[in-house]
Structures are given as structure tokens and as C-alpha cells.
Amino acid sequence: GVGGFHRAHEAAYLDRLMRRRAGSGPGGGAAAAAGGSCLEWGICGVGLLPGDARMRDVLAAQDHLYTLLLKHPGGLRDPAVIGSIHNYLFAPDDPEAVLALLSAPTTRIVSLTVTEGGYNVDDATGMFRTEAPGAVHDAEHPGEPTTAFGYIVEALRRRREAGIPALTVMSCDNLPGNGKVARTAVVSQAAMSDPELADWIDGNVAFPSCMVDRITPRTTRADVAELRRALGVEDAWPVVCEPFTQWVIEDDFPAGRPPWEEVGVQMVDDVVPYELMKLRLLNASHQGLAHWGRLLGMEYAHEAAADEDISSWVRAYLEREARATLRSVPGIDLDDYISTL
């Protein structure tokens, strides 16, 4: 999925890396000399749903470029043109083109941004919903998939038959253990039609978990108009987001990966401590803002954040209660993290 969050997060990180390695960013010359060009990496977006046709049309008209507009406190705007997406395939137009792309040796990572509910996994049981219409269709017609997992399974079947190494499937959705959830979805979809293939996938495909963070509200007409008025930029679908961003990834990429750590991504052995930190500090404080603000008759989050009483309650929760439940998190100063929040 190539929605707002993907374009504000993964695509933005890769764009920064490409610019750095090309010598146009801070330290770019030294980085390029040390590691060579990073322009071998790029993103080809894939849209599966009928509504994704508009993204196809907008990106094609703009040579797959778009504006990322960071909104700072106080109203400062910080725009950047993102160029890491080099193509976009709308699956209903040409399913075979998508399968050919996923099956190609040059494709080494398939990232997923399909929302928390897009994995067809039951929250209560952790089991794949084999009765879902899309799953049933893709099991009965594996060569004509309609779901993300049907496409991935068919592509992996082709790679296996052609002797092409397996790739990495990386979930970038905001749910705990997203790599495990992605593994469940892909392996279970394969098992519905080819148990032997499912075993091969389970043993050969990497499914690293990662923690993602960047508030990215839906782009409005007002955002488009503001960009046009303030900067003279005509962008049919810019992305607006907060300045803060974080990405923590389990370093399990047998087929290779971009050197994301050069642009602030934390590559770790285990993402769980970072997930707990985010859930208990960031997510819980957001929930506190919402509940306390609502009880005090406020309508918007920024009103709650500006209230001195609520701010003191949130800080007390973070420093006195939540922090005590967390062990040390590698590479993170929890006091600094709390201050940032």
C-alpha cells in the first residue's frame, strides 16, 4: 500500500539515504566514497484496491514525485520533494506485471503497509481467517490472486521453481509483532493450496518485525491549497506529517537491504523492548490526552496538550508509573524519549 504513512515514513527514509549516498545530503561525499551509490535501491508501489487507481494516476502525472510537508509546532513548514518511488503498479490493470515484479531476482524486499486490519488474522486467536472470501479465492486460483498475501505466495512459488532466492517480507504496520503476523498470513495462505510451499516459505523467507512511528494525518484540500499558495507548488497529493519519526527494525534481511542505519533507523536483534516503550509511553500518553481532554470538555488533542494540568498528569504518568515498568532499551535514553514526548 502506498498511502500517506508509507510516503511519509519508509519512502522518506529511503529518499534521505539516496540523497546522502549520492552526495547531495550532509556527509554525502564521505558516505558515497565509503559505500558506493545507494541508487540501486528504489520503491515500486503496488495498489490492489479499486480506490488505489487515483494514486496511480496522480503519481504517474508527477513522475512519481510528491511533496512531503513537515508541520512544526508554531506553524513552520518544511517541504521536501521525495523521489524514492520510481514506479507504481495498479494490480487490477495488470496482475501479471505485479507477479513478474515480485518474482524478479532484483526484488529483495516486499514491504507491507496494509493497515492493522489488513492481515486477515483474528485478533483473539491469532489465526488466519481461512474462510475469508479473498483467502478462499486465492487458494482456489493461486495464479490469479486478488489479495496481498495471494500475490506474495504466488510470487514465492515462482521464485522457488526458478531457483531464485527467497526475499524478505517486512510489515510496516503499527501492530505489535508485525513480522510474526505477516508470517502467519503468508504461510497460512500458502498452506491452503500448497502445504509443501508453505513449509518452504516458513523456512526460507524472513519476516522481520519493526516498530514505526510518525503521525501522518489525511491530506486535505486545504493542505494542497496551502502548498500552492505558500510555495507555488502544484502537487495533487502531497503528504503532511509531524517532524518526529522513528523506525526500529529487526536486522533479518538475507537477500540484502539498504543501509538504513545511516539515516537514523535503528537496526536491532529484537524489536520487543522498543514496542513496549512505544506502547507504554507514547501510545498511553496519547490515550491520556484524549480521555482527560474529553472529560474536561475539550474537542481537539492540541487543546489537551496545551493544558497545564493535563500536561502535568501526563508527565507524572510517564515518569512515575510507566517508566518503572520498562527495562533498559538499547540505544534509547528513556529520559530523553520522555522529554521528546
Task: For every predicted segment, state its role.
Residues G1-L341:
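Substrate/ligand-engaging "lid" and interaction regions
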